[in-house]
């Protein structure tokens, strides 16, 4: 599975919302789709499935706010 599909699947699983792929520029924090607990789970899933290490202390919410931004960061860190 490629990075984009993996991220979308992780987000859908974490949020229970399969419609994430319909709006890849939706701000996941402003809409309440992701909270701090889900963010930690997201980072753990990215680490486990894509071998990407993002220390929580270095996490900048603005850089990870939308599905498209998450995909871009994941590709950058691979």
From Swiss-Prot:
InterPro entries attached to this UniProt entry: ACP-like_sf (IPR036736), DltC (IPR003230), PP-bd_ACP (IPR009081)
UniProt modified residues of type O-(pantetheine 4'-phosphoryl)serine: 36
Pfam family of the protein (one): PP-binding
Modifications after synthesis and translation: 4'-phosphopantetheine is transferred from CoA to a specific serine of apo-DCP.
Signal peptide positions on this chain: none
A single BP term in Gene Ontology: cell wall organization
Main location: cytoplasm
MF GO annotations: D-alanyl carrier activity
Subcellular localization(s) per the UniProt record: Cytoplasm
UniProt pathway annotation: Cell wall biogenesis; lipoteichoic acid biosynthesis
Annotated keywords: Cell wall biogenesis/degradation, Cytoplasm, Phosphopantetheine, Phosphoprotein
Annotated disulfide bonds: none
Entry's Gene Ontology cellular component terms: cytoplasm
Domain Carrier intervals: 1-78
HAMAP family: DltC
NCBIfam families, per database record: dltC, PRK05087.1
Function field: Carrier protein involved in the D-alanylation of lipoteichoic acid (LTA). The loading of thioester-linked D-alanine onto DltC is catalyzed by D-alanine--D-alanyl carrier protein ligase DltA. The DltC-carried D-alanyl group is further transferred to cell membrane phosphatidylglycerol (PG) by forming an ester bond, probably catalyzed by DltD. D-alanylation of LTA plays an important role in modulating the properties of the cell wall in Gram-positive bacteria, influencing the net charge of the cell wall.
Family recorded in the similarity comment: Belongs to the DltC family.
Name of the protein described by the UniProt record: D-alanyl carrier protein
